[in-house]
Every structure is written in C-alpha cells, then in structure tokens.
Amino acid sequence: MSSLLNFYRKVLNVPLSLLVKSRAIPTDPVKELNLNLEQPIIYVLPYTSQTDLLILQKNCLSLNLPDPLQNNELNGQSLPRYVFLDEGRRFFKSKGAKSETESIFYRYLDLHRNNESLDVQLIPASVLWGRSPGKESEPHLRLMSSFQRIISMIWFGRDNFVRFSQALSLKYMVAEHGADEGIAQKLARVAKIHFAKQRYSAMGPRLPDRQAMFNKIIQSPAIKVAIEEEAKTKKISIEKARQEAEKIVNEIAADVSHESLRIADRVLSWLWNKLYQGINVQNGDRVRKLALEGHEIVYVPCHRSHMDYLLLSYLLYHQGLVPPHIAAGINLNFFPAGPIFRSWGAFFIRRTFKGNRLYSTIFREYLAELFYRGYSVEYFIEGGRSRTGRLLEPKTGMMSMTLQALQRGLTRPISIVPVYIGYEHVLEVDTYAKELRGAEKEKENAGLVLRVIKKLKNLGQCYVNFAEPIQVNNYLNQHFPEWKESQAEDSRPKWLNEAVDSVAHQVMININKAAAINAKNLIGSVLLASRQRALAREQLIEQVDSYLQLFKNVSYSDDAIVPNDNAEEMLNHVLTLPRSGVISEKDSFGEMIRLDRESAVLMTYYRNNIQHLFVLPSLVASIILHHESVSKDLIIKTVNRIYPFLKAELFLHFEENDVRNQVEAILTEFSAQRIVKYESDVLQINCVRVRALQLHAAGVREILQRYYISLSILLEHPEISRAALEKESRSIAQRLSILHGINAPEFFDKALFSTFSASLKAQGYFDSEGNCILEKAKEAEEILRSLISVEVQLTIQGAMEKVEEVENTETVVKTAEAVTEKNE
C-alpha cells in the first residue's frame, strides 16, 4: 500500500474524529448476524471512498470486529479484507464494477477448493450520510464528489450510520455454485443489487410534491363520486363540495420534513437519556429483512402511552429503517404539537366518521396512496391508549382499509408487524386511574404537555419487541383464497369482514407473544397476589425466582422477553424507582416489602401487561390448591373447559389441542420446584411450599370470579338478554370488589363482561334462538364454583338476591303507578 495513501488516511482521520459520530446497525453485529470470528471476514463497500472506509474501520474496532485495513493471511496468501464494488469519483471517472474486485472474489473462492475447514464470510457494509431521500422532482444522486463529501461531513457528521448486512458464506457459494470467474462476477452483481435495496430500505421513496399528491387524490374516481354525493345531499355546489374535500385532505395529510426528523433525533436522544435507564429493542432484524425484500410494512403496536408514537419512530430510525407515516388521533392536532407531529410523519384521523362518506372516502384514498407510493405506515389497532394495561379489543377500520388497498391491486406484498411496547413507568398512569374512577378525560393541549414534561425523570427501563410479522398476501392465500377474485372498486367483498377480523385478532395474539417481563411488572404481580399486598423479603424473592424459572423452563413463546437479572437484583432495581409504590419496611422479624395503598391500583396496570403469560400456570395452581389431591386428567379436563374463555379475553396463542402439552409441562415444572407432589399422575399440595402455590393461584382468581358471576346470573335467569347479563354482572362485580378489597379497575370493566358473553355464545352455551343451554352452563358453573372460596360465593349469592329485591320493588312500584294512572 502506498505511503501517500497512508498519509492521506492519517490526515483524513483528523476531521473525521472531530466531525463524525457514527452509529452501527445492528448495534451488536457479531451476535445479531451470527458472525464467526474464528473464520476470515471480507467487507464489501458499494463504491470507492476512503472516508467511508475509515468510518467502517473505526466502527469495526469498537465492535470487536476484524480491522478492514489489515489483510487476511490464508494459505500463504495475503488478501485484502475489504473491496469496493465501484470506482466512485476517482479522477472524475466512474467505470462501474472493478475488475480487481472480481479478481479478489475469485481468489477467495478458489481458496475454498482444497480447504474444507475454511469459510470466508462476505459482509456487505455501507455508510449512510443523512437519511433524506430527496423530493420527487430532484435527480437521483448516488456518488459524491470530494467537495460534496466535505459538506456531508460537516452537515451530516452526527447523522451517520454504518450498516452491516447478513454475511454470505463463500464456502456455501463454492459448494452450491462452484468457484469460477463467472461466480465472482455474479457475486459483485448481487452485492450491487443488495446495496440498492438497502439504500431504499433506509431512506424510503422520495417525498412527494404535496400539492400534486392532493390533486391526484381529489381527482380519483371514488372521491369525484363522493363530492357529487356531498353536493347533492347538502344542496351545495360541486365547487363548494370540492373545497370541503380539499380541506379534509389538508386536515389529514402528513407533511414530512427530513430536517425536522434530524432535529427530532437530537431532541429525542436527549429525552430518552433523561427519561429511561435503557431502551431494550428485540427482533429489529425481522423488519430490516422485510424492508430489504421490498415489502410494504405496516407497524401495528399496542398503545400504552403517547410516548409510543415518538419511541417507535425513533427506534426505527436507529434500526436503519424509514420512520413510518403514523395515524394519529385528531386530538393531537393542537398547536404547536400538530404541525411538529405532521412534519415527523403523522397524519390525522377523526375519532369517528361514521355516516360521513366524503371524509371516509378521502381517508381511504389517502391511505391507499401512501401504500401505492411505498411509504411504511403505523396505526394503533386498539383505537386508543389502554387504561387497564391489557390489550383492548381491536378496532378494525384501518385494517379493513389496508386489506382493501391490497385487494385493489397493490403490487408490493404487505407485511403487518405487530409491536409490543412496555414501560416500567407510564407517564399517564395516574390519569388512567382517575378516568377509570369516572373522571372526564382531559383534552390534550399545550398546558397538559407542560405538566407532563415536569414529571420527566427516571422512568426505569423501556421495552420494544417486534413480534412475528404477518405476511398478508400469504395469510389470505392460506385462509381466504377467494381474495384475489376481481371486485368492483366500490363493492365490499364477501370475504373481507371475516378476513379483517381474523388478521386483527392474529395481530393481538402476536403482540402478546412478544410481551416483555420486567422488574416492575413481575414484582408488582407477586405483591398483588398477596391479599395484604405485602410479603417478607425472603418470600418475595423466592416467589419471583419461581416465576423466572417457570418462564424460562416452560416458555409462553419464543418471542417473550424474560429478564437475565435474578430476583434480588430485580427487587433492588424496583426499590430505586421513583413513584414505584413498592416500599421496604423493617420490624423485629425482618424486612417486609409492600405496596402502598394508592399504588396498589396503579400496579395492576403493569401486572396486566404480562398477566396472559402466567394465567395458565395460575389456573393449574388454582385447581390443585382447591382440590388438594387431583388427577392429571381432571386438571386437563378442567383447563380445557375454562381455557376458551381465557383465550378470547387475553389473546392467548395456544390452540385447544396444544393445551394438554403446555399443562403437562407446567405440572412437571411445579413438581421440579417442589411446589406440588407429582406421583402416578396424581397431584398433591406440598404443605412445605403451599404459600408459593397460593401466590401462583392468585393470578387467575379475579378472572374466575367474574366468570362465576355471569354464569350464576345466567342459571338464575336463563331467559336474560346478553345486554342485561353484562349489566347485572358488572353491578355484582362492583359490589364484590368493595366487599373483598379487589383493587383491579378492570374487574368490573363492561368490555370484559361483553367478551365473556360473546365467548359463551361462541362456545355453544346458547341455542339458535338465544336461549341458555342449562346443562352445559351448569357444568361450567360447578367447575368454577369448585375454584372459588365459599366466602366469595356467598357474597355473589347475596348480591344477586339484592338485585332481585330491587327489581321486584321496581316492578311493584311500576304496577302501582299504572293502577293509579288507570283509576285517575
């Protein structure tokens, strides 16, 4: 290597060290890309740039990867550890693929002929300067001159990413395709195509001319018809209806600015460092793979907080992906937040537009246009933020529009990426508790934002897990093959409603499969399982350890995140969190850990984030606890009867025929932990560890009580309507929560009783005329009664009698009033 080039690199390193701060994608390539550091590595860069090469070198050294400027010494040959695919702008020439690169590829391939132990890993690596794709009217620029590179160094030095791609095994290439010069040329061509796809996945399509996009939408046939209908219905001119349509488009549409996104990146980096001790991201490689394969990506996260919007876009940006266009509630379109969010990719949607055909048509066309142009999209399928910490029933309007866009002939495949977002502290949790107690929801405004900002300090850890994607084209081909049949544009296909519900439900299941257990939600779950919300420190540690072993040995799913910390470390972490509500107290017997009274209600929010993970073990524990000695077959039979209700309520992923294996694994684990005695297919309480069994069983206690309330009412009044059943169940649940100190606000949530009554219907507890099938309901009621304390049973029966007395009194009063009115 020439001394002149070495000198040039040393000089160039000076401004680079001062001006450039780059970030690696992924952050741990050795682990995430499964690199074998025992085997040689060769880096492939898209075109000649000493600047990019030096930035790559700096990142490789910091990530414990081999230095690209050092050669690989193989079989007596010294071969470069990097290659450039293109000449770049050396001496104002751009010759295309370099013959020397193909020659180096060939020499590496040739080494594999007689060396079976050799496996050179070819890693595509590119350096991104800024992330703006430019405007549609601008020419495509690929290579930069020296002057442009200097300007980029100054302007984009802090917006610099080094992207490592999945390694290609040259041993595999030789085994499959041989090692001639043609294969070397093919490698270079494939690498070029890869870099083009990678650039598109990181920068996305070019930004549209906003007015031209508006005009295209307004001129679409569907909107022209809607404008004419609006004019006719409201008896206004076509021009006035068109102006109204333009106002609606302007109200909805995003106005993305990459300069605004760059500023947001700086601000949010500061904010996250101030707020969180760490942001844990899992499975980002799934999304990067889909983007490289050219999929239209739709992100569908659960909705815990307003922070979700900002957090997901920020993380996608740092995963080397394009921040999506985000469907945001119109309530967030207030000054100054509205214009800022719009520049970050938010497009606004009204809470309801039922009956407003012009608005619904425009919104559907705008969403279809985003898909057509290749922009990724994000929306919250729950419709609003969960106030209880559980997933809400999906609102399917946006999902319906997504499937309709595909059905209309979208050329790119659509992949829906469910996303689990979890926090150790949700900023709005106090507000949620007030709203659940009946307070009015406070309208979002600048003052509210300022009050929230005052709370911004240590909020613990944050978790984002990209769940298993749903490749919609494949899903529809498998479950709804008729979807490809042509339909008139304004007609609604017969398959659509069922397909929308099916995909939406699968999204919720996949989100729950990707749940993250953290210190706060696990410690909180254990304390809430104790009736006094308090445990001795040793007992708490023992129970948390029991849960950790259970989650690791009998995993809910491969995507669920189980912490690596031990119980002691998790408890110490929670005790340091401000406003956690977990208090340590000492007396003459030792240390006690308890929840303060006010925080008990708030902690149910965090428990509910992961309740679905332990509800099946809790049910198994409850059956053993109440029977004391019970056969395995009876446990499985009981679980099978109750499981469909749990599955519907908590979006569990086990199919009915998988439940037996899961229950057997739970029993084996309980036995291994000596929580129960397991001999000859009979389970018995182990008196030494009965407290651990009680705490496990408590996780499902309140759910079973709710089911028992509804079935008791149904048996007492078989002719009752579903609406009346839900209303009466809720009234009794409210009374039970007061008398037995049940702090969970969702205990009398009308949505849960509605879900249960729908499950009863789906499971065949009603005949075709809507009448209760008494024998089946009685069997289920007896099973539930065996799992509920006598004290709770008596309270429920007493409440039912009170309700009946009130109803009888009301009937007498109404009859008397009718007689009086008749006599008058």
From Swiss-Prot:
Q: EC?
A: 2.3.1.15
> Under the GO molecular function aspect, what terms does this record hold?
glycerol-3-phosphate O-acyltransferase activity
Does the entry annotate any disulfide bonds, and if so which pairs?
none
InterPro entries, A to Z:
GPAT/DHAPAT, GPAT/DHAPAT_C, GPAT/DHAPAT_LPLAT, GPAT_PlsB, Plipid/glycerol_acylTrfase
The Gene Ontology biological process terms listed for this entry are:
CDP-diacylglycerol biosynthetic process; fatty acid metabolic process
Catalytic activity reads:
sn-glycerol 3-phosphate + an acyl-CoA = a 1-acyl-sn-glycero-3-phosphate + CoA
- Is this entry keyworded Oxidoreductase? no
Q: Which NCBIfam families match?
A: plsB, PRK04974.1
UniProt-recorded name of the protein? Glycerol-3-phosphate acyltransferase
